[in-house]
Amino acid sequence: MPNVSLTAKGGGHYIEDQWDTQVVEAGVFDDWWVHVEAWNKFLDNLRGINFSVASSRSQVAEYLAALDRDLPADVDRRFAGARGQIGSPNYLPAPKFFRLDKRTIAELTRLSRLTDQPHNNRDIELNRAKRATTNPSPPAQAPSENLTLRDVQPLKDSALHYQYVLIDLQSARLPVYTRKTFERELALEWIIPDAEEA
């Protein structure tokens, strides 16, 4: 479900000139806006991946593709806020969003690209190691062991790289936004039309 679904259309709008300058032209749409709970769940999923298993590695891209990242606001949709009256049983507090900048987005892209390592080359190396040899003596087994080691090394390297990138993501201090933070930092004013104009 996209983040904008947490907003409601109508009841007012942001000043268009402010929106165009401080949001559109400033590239705020290009950043990723991820709900705090969704981000924490995403990291939990990444921590659960066994990167040494090829079938598990493909899950990285799947988790990333499923991550909602759109801006939870528009010129006629106020940034997602609290729902209901505070203190009432149906009250829902204002959702919080992490704002991911270009550097963090690049880290996530790099993480998903680690899953694109080809498997055919390693299979070829293993097949080559199984070819019949004219000399069945014990020394002939040494090349086979070397080829096997060369086969697993790329996977070990990428698994180690995956852990490093994951640690960077977990330790990153991402800015947190609520409606108040968003409107204050971007200097946006929400206009409510007069009753006679509605």
Swiss-Prot record:
List cellular component terms (GO): helical viral capsid
The molecular function GO annotations come to: identical protein binding; structural molecule activity
Mind telling me which InterPro entries this protein's record contains?
A: TMV-like_coat, TMV-like_coat_sf
Q: Which SUPFAM superfamilies match?
A: TMV-like viral coat proteins
Basic and acidic residues compositional bias: what residue ranges? 119-128
Domain of life, source organism: Viruses
Localisation per UniProt entry: Virion
Keyword Ion transport listed? The answer is no
Query: What's a Pfam family this protein contains?
Result: TMV_coat
Q: Which UniProt keywords apply?
A: Capsid protein, Helical capsid protein, Virion
Could you tell me which residues belong to the region Disordered? 117-147
Q: Which family does it belong to?
A: Belongs to the virgaviridae capsid protein family.
Q: What else is known?
A: The genome of this virus consists of three linear, positive, single-stranded RNAs encapsidated in separate virions designated RNA-alpha, RNA-beta and RNA-gamma. Three proteins (alpha-A, beta-A and gamma-A) are translated directly from these genomic RNAs and the remaining proteins encoded on RNA-beta (beta-B, beta-C and beta-D) and RNA-gamma (gamma-B) are expressed via three subgenomic messenger RNAs.
Q: What function does the entry list?
A: Capsid protein self-assembles to form rod-shaped virions about 21,6 nm in diameter for the narrow nes and 22,4 for the wide ones, and 110-150 nm in length depending on the size of the encapsidated RNA. They display a helical symmetry of 23.2 subunits per turn of the viral helix and with a central canal enclosing the viral genomic RNA.
Q: How does it assemble?
A: Interacts with itself.
Question: What is the recorded name of this protein?
Answer: Capsid protein
Q: What is the lineage of its organism?
A: Viruses, Riboviria, Orthornavirae, Kitrinoviricota, Alsuviricetes
